[in-house]
Structures are given as structure tokens and as C-alpha cells.
């Protein structure tokens, strides 16, 4: 509710002029002027000394949490816990079944004829050496190291980049090619930094013929031959 403030006004007091200065009454025929006096404290109800006169009332409604949201959150948590429990149960059941099957298989091999057991042991013991022997049967000059895989990947990347560079050089002969469109803009952004390296080294012939792409292709071919020689 709004605050109710009481305001009190005092009526002014009129005093005749004869009470204060009677000498003006005999000289003029007009009625004496009236004087207005106001009290020193016209609004005592609003003074600081009377704080009880100003009242402020405020009401705040209590915050109520919606029951619907709590019910939804509990339902979601229950579904999550239920699904987690079901997955854990299935995983435990699968592990138990595989363990039982492995035990039964080992018992069956032990109780079977010794010929089958000896053949199984022989096949398992010779599988590893045969695998590593097949890895060693490589042509001469082959590097059986992790760097070989990296070298093969670099060689393939150089071949692809050489093809893209060839497309860029061939299309540069046509002046009306829209290089702002895709995929032409991607080709330009990929090849121009590499071509600019050689344009600064070899200037154009007669200021018209640019032969710097020939040097760029020669460098790519040299790198490709080096990588191919390292892979064997």
C-alpha cells in the first residue's frame, strides 16, 4: 500500500496596522493595510524530528518454486540412472558369458585328444614368426621404419599439388576467368604464395612472359624424386 502522509496547514494571522504603527491611521482615509505573518514551522508533520509521520509500507510476495520443474528434473534423473544401470548390467552379463565360454573351451581342449591340442599350440606359436617374416620380405632399399609412411604421404601430396599448380598456370592464360568464385578462389589462394616465391627470383621476359612456374615445377619434381628414392 502507498504511504499516507498527513499534512497540516496553519491559517495566517491578520493584524491591523494600527496595532503596529498607529501614526498612519490619522493621515490617510484609506483602511490600514493588512500584514501577513507565517509560522516558522508551517509543516511540522514533515520535519525530521517527527519520523513517525512518514510511513512507508511495502509487501513482497514469497518466491515459490514451481513443482512442475522439480518433477521433470526428477523424472529425467531417474531415466538416466535407469539407462545407466541397464547398460552396466548388460556389460557385466557379456563379460561373465565370455569368461564362462573361455573356461569351457580351455577345459574342452585339455580333455580332448592330445593331437588337437598339439596342433593348436603349434599354429599359435608359428603365427607370430610367419607374420614378422612376411614383413621382412621386402625389395632391397626398402626402409622398414615409420618414416616410410610419412615419405609415401608426402609423395602423394606433392603429386596432387603439382596437378593443382598445373591447373592454376593453365587458367592464368585466360584473362576472363572469375577467380572470385569457388573453387577457383581456393586454387588461387593455394598456389599463388608458392608461385610468388619464384616470381621474385626470375623476372618476366620482355615484361610479358612469366617463366617462373617452370622453376616451381622443377623444384616440385626434385622433391618428389627424393621422396620416391627414400621409400624405395
UniProtKB/Swiss-Prot annotation:
Subcellular location as annotated: Plastid, Chloroplast thylakoid membrane
Transmembrane annotation, as ranges: 147-167, 201-221
Source taxon at top rank: Eukaryota
One Pfam family hit: YGGT
The organelle targeting sequence, given as a residue range: 1-16
GO biological process, one term: nucleoid organization
Membrane topology, from the record: Multi-pass membrane protein
InterPro entries according to UniProt: CCB3/YggT
Main subcellular location: plastid
Keyword annotations: Chloroplast, Membrane, Plastid, Thylakoid, Transit peptide, Transmembrane, Transmembrane helix
Assigned GO CC terms: chloroplast; chloroplast envelope; chloroplast thylakoid membrane; cytosol; thylakoid membrane
Protein function: Required for the proper distribution of nucleoids in chloroplasts. The nucleoid partitioning by YLMG1-1 may be related to chloroplast division processes.
Extra remark beyond the main annotation: Plant over-expressing YLMG1-1 have impaired chloroplast division leading to reduced number and enlarged chloroplasts in mesophyll cells. Plants silencing YLMG1-1 show a pale green phenotype in young emerging leaves and the basal part of expanding leaves.
Family: Belongs to the YggT family.
Protein name as it appears in the record: YlmG homolog protein 1-1, chloroplastic
Organism of this sequence: Arabidopsis thaliana
Gene: YLMG1-1
Amino acid at each position: 500500500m502507498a504511504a499516507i502522509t498527513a499534512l497540516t496547514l496553519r491559517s495566517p494571522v491578520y493584524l491591523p496596522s494600527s496595532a503596529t504603527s498607529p501614526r498612519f491611521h490619522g493621515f490617510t482615509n484609506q483602511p490600514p493595510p493588512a500584514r501577513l505573518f507565517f509560522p516558522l514551522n508551517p509543516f511540522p508533520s514533515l520535519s525530521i524530528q517527527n519520523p513517525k509521520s512518514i510511513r512507508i509500507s511495502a509487501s513482497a510476495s514469497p518466491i515459490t518454486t514451481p513443482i512442475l520443474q522439480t518433477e521433470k528434473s526428477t523424472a529425467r534423473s531417474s531415466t538416466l540412472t535407469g539407462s545407466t544401470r541397464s547398460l552396466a548390467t548388460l556389460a557385466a552379463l557379456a563379460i561373465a558369458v565370455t569368461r564362462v565360454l573361455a573356461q569351457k573351451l580351455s577345459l574342452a581342449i585339455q580333455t580332448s585328444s592330445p593331437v588337437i591340442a598339439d596342433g593348436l599350440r603349434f599354429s599359435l606359436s608359428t603365427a607370430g614368426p610367419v607374420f614378422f617374416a612376411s614383413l621382412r620380405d621386402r625389395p632391397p632399399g626398402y626402409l622398414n621404419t615409420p618414416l616410410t609412411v610419412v615419405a609415401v604421404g608426402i609423395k602423394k601430396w606433392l603429386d596432387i599439388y603439382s596437378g593443382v599448380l598445373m591447373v592454376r598456370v593453365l587458367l592464368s592464360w585466360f584473362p576472363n576467368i572469375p577467380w572470385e568464385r569457388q573453387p577457383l578462389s581456393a586454387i588461387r589462394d593455394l598456389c599463388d604464395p608458392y608461385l610468388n616465391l619464384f616470381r621474385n627470383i626470375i623476372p618476366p621476359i620482355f615484361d610479358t612472359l612469366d617463366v617462373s612456374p617452370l622453376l616451381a615445377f622443377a623444384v616440385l619434381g626434385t622433391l618428389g624424386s627424393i621422396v620416391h628414392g627414400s621409400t624405395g
